[in-house]
From Swiss-Prot:
UniProt organism field: Desulforapulum autotrophicum (strain ATCC 43914 / DSM 3382 / VKM B-1955 / HRM2)
Encoding gene, per UniProt annotation: pyrB
Enzyme class: transferase
Main function: Catalyzes the condensation of carbamoyl phosphate and aspartate to form carbamoyl aspartate and inorganic phosphate, the committed step in the de novo pyrimidine nucleotide biosynthesis pathway.
Record protein name field: Aspartate carbamoyltransferase catalytic subunit
Pfam families in the record: OTCace, OTCace_N
Length: 312
């Protein structure tokens, strides 16, 4: 079965079958990363442009490593090294890149909808690496992979998401992705950090963190995104940590085999304690590992792959 999407822009456009195909393919890709020689010729001759207009550590390096492990040629452009700083529009940048015939453009941008706009103006496949507060599909896919690895299935799991929901593209994509795969999603945050109408995405809003994480199978913690906040949304970090921080005592409210996740970067001592972040329930580093596998799968599939990666 051939993957039918030219672009990966959000979780809404992916069906359950699409998501399952991506996760199955990523499992095969993960095996490649365990080999002594972590490279296959699958995308030799393909060119991938990483156009990142916001700071990134994990996502950018993960996409870059994914491209190289598939033998693609990758070029990395940041805001400071592109002509955008000279006043060039994003569309003009994309058209100029298109003139060089890349196969895939990976875009991170501070404006919601930017990858959708670019996808309309280029023939290359576009993968959204995070756009404003809108979406971060590859993060959700690696989260789904991490949960499926640990729990065996996604259907019926209780997923708790706690933190700055209003400014989090990860929260929006995860709510959509996990509910689409049959999980039950409950969120919690200060009232100033919960967007109006978020329930329309299929989640429940808990009155406080304790009730949110009670009997949870998975807890996803989110950092406070101060860089996107125009006003002060809580009194102090200490008060926030007391009400919405995940510590060892609060973790006991969840199921004994709960897994704790975080998209990074972590603000230790604020939304998550050192003991929890580094404890036995944490799968935060597994998420990073799976991020490479998922992004390898996305490159492979949008480039025309039609099966899982077991024989690559």
């Amino acid at each position: 079965m051939r993957f039918e999407h030219k672009d990966i822009l959000d979780m809404e456009s992916l069906s359950v079958q699409d998501i399952t195909m991506i996760l199955d393919t990523a499992e095969g890709m993960k095996e490649i990363s365990k080999r002594p020689v972590k490279k296959v010729p699958t995308l030799r001759g393909k060119t991938i442009v990483l156009l990142f207009q916001e700071p990134s550590t994990r996502t950018k390096s993960s996409f870059d490593i994914a491209a190289k492990r598939l033998s693609a040629d990758s070029i990395s452009l940041s805001k400071s090294t592109s002509s955008i700083v000279k006043g060039e529009t994003l569309i003009d940048t994309a058209r100029n890149l298109e003139a060089m015939n890349p196969d895939i453009i990976v875009l991170r941008h501070p404006s919601s909808g930017a990858p959708h706009l670019i996808a309309k103006h280029v023939n290359a496949s576009v993968i959204n690496a995070g756009d404003g507060i809108h979406a971060h599909p590859s993060q959700t896919l690696l989260d789904l992979m991490s949960v499926r690895e640990k729990k065996g299935e996604l259907q019926g799991l209780n997923i708790s998401i706690v933190g700055d929901i209003s400014h989090s593209r990860v929260a929006r994509s995860n709510i959509t992705g996990f509910t689409k795969m049959g999980a039950n999603v409950t969120i919690s945050a200060p009232a100033t950090m919960i967007p109006r109408g978020i329930e329309a995405l299929g989640c429940k809003v808990a009155p406080d963190m304790d009730s949110c994480i009670e009997n949870a199978d998975v807890i996803i913690m989110l950092r406070i995104q101060k860089e996107r906040q125009e006003n002060i949304l809580f009194p102090t970090e200490r008060e926030y940590a007391a009400l919405f921080g995940l510590n060892a005592q609060r973790l006991k409210l969840a199921k004994p085999d709960v897994i704790v996740m975080h998209p990074g970067p972590l603000n230790r001592g604020v939304e998550i304690s050192n003991q929890v972040a580094d404890g036995r329930n944490s799968v935060i580093l597994d998420q990073v590992t799976n991020g490479v596998a998922v992004r390898m799968a996305l490159f492979y599939l949008v480039a025309g792959g039609s099966r899982n990666a077991d024989t690559i």
